[in-house]
């Protein structure tokens, strides 16, 4: 095991269970906690002003750092609202893209280097207009200027970006819940666990195991899981059932916040890939990590696939997934909340 992998696993264990390293970092977490509280108080008492869009804003975010399954939820929300008569658009920070000038607005097939991995994936999956900028209020203004027909904005991963006023907050968490309950760096949280009592809804990504979730009083709570649909070859778009790969020599790779979740999704489809490459989140694939992989097929995430076309590796297959909710009334609940906003 490399030194980097050792420290990464140690940190993840400490974030889940606590321990000596978490205790050592606890004073820094107290400073982060104070900074977070002061920021929220500044917006609450009017010392800082949030920009309010002329249309409703729905934030989909989390308090646990890293991947919890937000992107499939954003896709489901965009598609669900469109099916209910809305014209939705999305704003995002555009993580990984260097945006130093005005916001970037696009639709359809977008360059992940210019828009970021998640916005490019969501735009391709839904066809919804997207705008990206570190200042999400500017992104929202640019989105509405370019697409005045938009009547609801979905803010991807914007829970802590208080400069953009919001009407509905949805938190996506996974089976890790709130971990050891501490803020960064002693724990995995961006905000205190009590923040969950203030949001409108909590969606827990169960994956294939039992959830250990925080108990909250105010929020509606749904469970979700990712259902694997089929595989799409990256080089030519050919689709094939996942069952067709059973019995073949297959591998898997994921450059996302929680690679293990992707590997378990494949297992739920009856596949046992080996090797399994856990790549860094937002891995850019400027160099192929697959040269030494001996496999007939290599499964990758849809987010990684948008960056892998240039590799021209016919073994690469993107696994298409769909967010399923424990109660199908989630999107109806969201529709009703939007229609009853003041």
From Swiss-Prot:
Catalytic activity: a lipid A disaccharide + ATP = a lipid IVA + ADP + H(+)
Molecular-function GO term, any one: ATP binding
Keywords in alphabetical order: ATP-binding, Kinase, Lipid A biosynthesis, Lipid biosynthesis, Lipid metabolism, Nucleotide-binding, Transferase
InterPro entries in the cross-refs: LpxK, P-loop_NTPase
Biological process (GO), any one: lipopolysaccharide core region biosynthetic process
Biological pathway: Glycolipid biosynthesis; lipid IV(A) biosynthesis; lipid IV(A) from (3R)-3-hydroxytetradecanoyl-[acyl-carrier-protein] and UDP-N-acetyl-alpha-D-glucosamine: step 6/6
EC numbers for this chain: 2.7.1.130
Gene Ontology cellular component list: plasma membrane
Binding site for ATP: 64-71
UniProt key word Electron transport: no
Pfam families per record: LpxK
Enzyme type, top EC level: transferase
Primary role: Transfers the gamma-phosphate of ATP to the 4'-position of a tetraacyldisaccharide 1-phosphate intermediate (termed DS-1-P) to form tetraacyldisaccharide 1,4'-bis-phosphate (lipid IVA).
Record-given protein name: Tetraacyldisaccharide 4'-kinase
Source organism of the structure: Bordetella avium (strain 197N)
Gene designation: lpxK
């Amino acid at each position: 095991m490399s030194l980097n992998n050792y420290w990464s696993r140690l940190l993840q264990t400490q974030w889940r269970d606590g321990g000596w390293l978490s205790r050592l970092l606890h004073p820094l977490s107290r400073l982060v906690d104070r900074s977070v509280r002061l920021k929220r108080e500044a917006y609450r008492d009017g010392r800082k002003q949030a920009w309010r869009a002329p249309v409703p804003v729905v934030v989909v975010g989390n308090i646990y750092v890293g991947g919890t399954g937000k992107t499939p939820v954003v896709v489901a929300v965009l598609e669900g609202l469109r099916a209910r008569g809305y014209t939705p658009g999305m704003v995002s920070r555009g993580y990984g893209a260097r945006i130093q000038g005005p916001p970037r607005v696009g639709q359809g097939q977008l360059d992940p280097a210019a828009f970021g991995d998640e916005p490019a994936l969501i735009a391709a999956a839904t066809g919804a207009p997207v705008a990206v900028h570190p200042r999400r209020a500017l992104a929202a203004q640019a989105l509405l200027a370019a697409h005045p027909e938009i009547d609801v904005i979905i803010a991807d991963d914007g829970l802590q970006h208080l400069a953009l006023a919001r009407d509905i907050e949805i938190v996506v968490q996974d089976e890790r819940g709130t971990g050891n309950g501490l803020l960064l760096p002693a724990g995995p949280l961006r905000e205190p666990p009590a923040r969950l009592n203030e949001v409108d809804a909590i969606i827990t990504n169960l994956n294939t195991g039992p959830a250990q979730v925080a108990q909250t009083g105010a929020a509606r709570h749904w469970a979700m899981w990712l259902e694997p649909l089929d595989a799409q070859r990256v080089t030519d778009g050919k689709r094939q059932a996942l069952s067709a790969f059973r019995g073949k020599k297959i591998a898997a790779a994921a450059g996302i916040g929680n690679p293990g979740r992707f590997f378990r999704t494949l297992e739920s489809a009856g596949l046992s890939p080996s090797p399994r490459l856990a790549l860094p989140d937002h891995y850019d694939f400027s160099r192929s990590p697959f040269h030494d992989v001996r496999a007939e097929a290599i499964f990758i995430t849809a987010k990684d696939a948008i960056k892998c076309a240039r590799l021209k590796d016919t073994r690469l297959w993107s696994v298409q997934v769909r967010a399923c909710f424990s109660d199908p009334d989630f999107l109806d609940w969201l529709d009703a909340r939007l229609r009853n906003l003041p």
